[in-house]
């Protein structure tokens, strides 16, 4: 039976008070019933990819970048709001040649967080297939983040503990807090990192509070020292990092 004939049959039966569903609607209902959570999570990660691409494609060049690699996907508005906070801080930190600050985002979720995402809160059913697919995408994102770390383009990182430990940042990349501040601040996560939620800047700026409080702030060494321009940029990174950690509410 053709679609045209089927539509006429539906109209006729509907006129007689009999509701006949088009097969395409039945197919979608069946797909949703059996694969609801897979569809939701796939759509979620597609949203993550689209947001990341949009942020990269629409963000103008900045002088220095802060990289977020944590358990949250910022919307476009949230991303811009976070950038404005650090850009304002830059203006208050530098008296001349004020660097424009950009934020690069690599959303990365822990395995426990992924398991929660793929578990139906009503039934407790776990979608193992969708979980494994998302886990693979997560691994790819971590690899991309790792490659970006090696470029030396960024020295200020906001990462979750999984990224911090997976990249061995305290062994290979991070500058000891005592080297920057003269001593390790009380309450620091370890000798290299401070929790974002413990800083005054996080408490003061509501825009930053979309990021998880247990996000770690890490300052890393530059791989490409030598050229005067690189050294100048690194010193700007260092000054901004200190301003973030030592921020005092007005």
Per-range role (PLM):
Residues 21-30:
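Cytosolic juxtamembrane amphipathic/interface segments immediately preceding
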Residues 64, 96-99, 151-155:
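Loop/turn elements at helix/coil->beta-strand transitions in domains of secreted/extracellular proteins
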Residues 69-108:
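Short extracytoplasmic
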Residues 32-57:
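Hydrophobic membrane-insertion alpha-helices, especially the h-region
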Residues 118-197:
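Extracytoplasmic "Venus flytrap"/periplasmic binding protein-like
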Residues 1-19:
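N-terminal intrinsically disordered, acidic low-complexity segments at the extreme N-terminus
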Residues 58-71:
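Alpha-helical transmembrane signal-anchor/signal-peptide segments
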Residues 199-250:
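Bilobed periplasmic-binding protein/Venus flytrap-like ligand-binding cleft at the lobe interface
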């Amino acid at each position: 039976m053709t679609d045209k004939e089927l539509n006429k049959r539906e109209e006729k039966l509907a006129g007689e008070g009999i509701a006949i569903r088009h097969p395409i609607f039945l197919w979608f209902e069946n797909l949703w019933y059996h694969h609801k959570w897979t569809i939701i999570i796939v759509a979620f990660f597609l949203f993550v990819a689209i947001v990341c691409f949009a942020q990269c494609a629409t963000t103008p060049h900045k002088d220095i970048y802060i990289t977020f690699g944590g358990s949250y996907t910022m919307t476009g508005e949230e991303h811009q709001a976070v950038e404005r906070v650090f850009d304002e801080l830059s203006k208050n930190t530098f008296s001349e040649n004020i660097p424009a600050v950009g934020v690069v985002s690599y959303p990365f979720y822990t395995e426990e967080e992924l398991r929660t995402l793929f578990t139906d809160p009503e039934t407790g059913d776990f979608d193992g297939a969708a979980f494994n697919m998302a886990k693979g995408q997560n691994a790819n994102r971590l690899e991309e983040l790792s490659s970006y770390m090696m470029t030396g383009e960024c020295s200020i990182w906001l990462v979750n503990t999984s990224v911090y430990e997976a990249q061995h940042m305290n062994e290979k990349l991070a500058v000891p807090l005592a080297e920057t501040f003269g001593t390790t601040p009380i309450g620091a996560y370890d000798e290299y990192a401070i929790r974002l939620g413990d800083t005054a800047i996080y408490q003061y700026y509501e825009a930053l509070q979309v990021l998880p409080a247990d996000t770690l702030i890490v300052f890393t060494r530059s791989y490409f020292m030598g050229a005067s321009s690189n050294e100048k940029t690194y010193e700007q990174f260092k000054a901004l990092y200190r301003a973030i950690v030592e921020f005092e509410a007005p």
